[in-house]
């Protein structure tokens, strides 16, 4: 029980943490090298459902790898809404059609992939919710949960994966060169999803030289 002297002098505050959970595509593999497929999957995931079911409501969707409300984040960017209609339209544009057994197919091949994650209950639950939502629009998803050392050495380092559910913690330093620069894709480096964008490379390099915080 609270001490009488403190009972009326305390207040509880909620503050968003510096970590986030993400779905990471292997951009060097089909069909994840197709932007429309990635966008469709984003639309098909009910992020509010994940936040309520996994985080007990203590979280919010984000639209970039920067914490909302910080000087590094862009308030004009909005998270993808949950819309199966938009997801299916994008997949249709990408060449997929619904088969008789209600799965998406392109050139005779079903749209299916494996999500891998480490032994973390929140990430396992997140993967299951994603799997259910993607099944609703005709995407086959399997889940594999792997011990961390095997996860890194057998799958991440050699790039032998389709999709991962992982988490990342942000530091006070906004520099994310090691995560997103195209030069950081080697074994043991952090850009293991294979993100490669020349404009982003230039901005990351410029950011490392910039001393003006407002820029």
Regions found by a protein language model. Give the residues of each.
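Extracellular/periplasmic solute-recognition and catalytic clefts
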Residues: 1-29, 52
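Small-molecule pocket liners
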Residues: 19-23, 64, 191
